[in-house]
Design a protein with these regions (language model features):
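Zn-dependent metallopeptidase/amidohydrolase metal-coordination segment
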Residues: 82, 106, 180, 192-196, ...
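Acidic/histidine-rich catalytic neighborhood of metal-dependent amide-processing enzymes
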Residues: 3-72
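A short beta-alpha structural unit
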Residues: 202-205, 232-247
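Short beta-strand/turn micro-motifs at beta-sheet edges
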Residues: 67-71, 185-190
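Short, solvent-exposed beta-strand/turn "edge" segments of beta-rich domains on protein surfaces
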Residues: 98-99, 187-194
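Alpha-helical metal-binding/catalytic segments enriched in His/Glu/Asp
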Residues: 1-34, 79-83, 96-116, 200, ...
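Acidic-enriched catalytic cores of C-N bond-cleaving enzymes acting on peptides and small amides
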Residues: 71, 78, 92-180, 208-230
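Short, low-order "capping/linker" segments at domain edges
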Residues: 242-260
Length: 329
């Protein structure tokens, strides 16, 4: 979608007299497959990426038809944890009830990373920050995240008041269990599990120290694993978040062009994903302005088997990009 958008913008630009901007386009896809070729190229040949303004089309509007600049990206980390309780699995009929179950121990440790309303808590880490940008309504989140009927948004049941969604997805740490292994269901036997392991995905708000918070998660897991179970928790990798100022000249101009293309005021939002390229480019070129936008509004369901794009988003974002390239010079 974003590639088609760039092509449409270039065609519109050519049809309307071109631009005086010295223009570079980079299209790269290996990062989505875990490749590091672009990261290495930025380190080896930073001069190739020198620019006054860097526009990264790897984001999207908050909704179809609502022009949006992304001003904040979460950083994150991958954390591995393993719990061992027995030298080997033992018969649940003979030992169950007294023998410590490694799977249960790991479940309890992971569960301790949430309060009673499902909000993330980490020993020694502030998890109460407030988001000051555009709101993210509970209704929109339910639709975007495709919650099943009757399921609750985390923090929704707090008697003191529901926690705003934007706080939890853009301003506070979040932990997701992305993998869990003990005995596969297909191989279930009547035995007390001796070992269990999990992989956790940590997301942290822009400006937070992802590595330090990941270390705090590991310490929390060690502290909260019950029954004297042996626990190993380690940070597998981490990456920093990113924030940009929408009031700087290039971002402000892009916002104006988006507003003109959509005939609506441009909003600012955070984004839960991480784009390591942003921090790598900013480190290589500290004075460059970086703006994040694109065609990936929530209904695109990016990274899913049925991802899609709304053609009107391609049309309008392309028009905004063409306007920007005409005026930025």
């Amino acid at each position: 979608g974003n590639v088609a958008m760039h092509l449409a913008a270039l065609r519109a630009l050519e049809a309307n007299g071109g631009t005086k901007v010295n223009l570079k386009y980079l299209i790269e896809g290996s990062e989505e497959r875990g490749g590091e070729g672009l990261s290495q190229l930025i380190k080896d040949r930073p001069e190739l990426f020198a620019a006054d303004a860097i526009l990264i089309a790897d984001a999207g509007n908050s909704a179809v038809g609502q022009p949006t600049l992304t001003t904040s990206l979460r950083g994150g980390a991958q954390i591995g944890v393993q719990v061992d309780t027995l030298a080997a699995g033992v018969h649940s009929g003979q030992f169950g009830g007294a023998a410590p179950d490694a799977a249960k121990a790991l479940m309890r440790a992971i569960d301790s990373l949430s309060d009673e309303y499902g909000r993330t808590v980490i020993d020694g880490v502030d998890t109460t920050a407030e988001w000051s940008g555009q709101e993210y309504s509970a209704e929109a989140f339910r639709a975007d995240a495709q919650l099943l009927e009757g399921t609750k948004i985390m923090g929704e049941d707090d008697p003191a008041g529901a926690t705003p969604v934007a706080n939890m997805v853009w301003s506070r740490p979040a932990i997701t269990v992305t993998g869990f292994t003990s005995t596969p269901v297909a191989e279930a036997v009547n035995a007390v599990p001796a070992t269990a392991s999990a992989q956790l995905n940590l997301r942290v708000p822009a400006g937070a120290d992802a590595a330090a918070i990941a270390d705090a998660v590991c310490a929390h897991l060690r502290s909260h694993t019950p029954w004297g179970a042996h626990v190993k928790a380690e940070v597998l990798e981490s990456n920093a978040g990113f924030a940009t100022d929408p009031e700087k000249p290039a971002a402000a101009l892009l916002g104006e062009c988006l507003s003109e293309a959509y005939n609506a005021e441009t909003a600012a939002q955070g984004m839960g994903g991480s784009i390591p390229l942003t921090t790598e480019l900013q480190e290589a070129h500290p004075n460059a302005e970086i703006a994040l936008y694109g065609v990936e509004e929530p209904k695109c369901t990016i990274h899913s088997a049925n991802e899609s794009v709304d053609p009107t988003e391609i049309e309008n974002i392309a028009a905004a990009e063409a306007l920007f390239l005409q005026r930025y010079s």
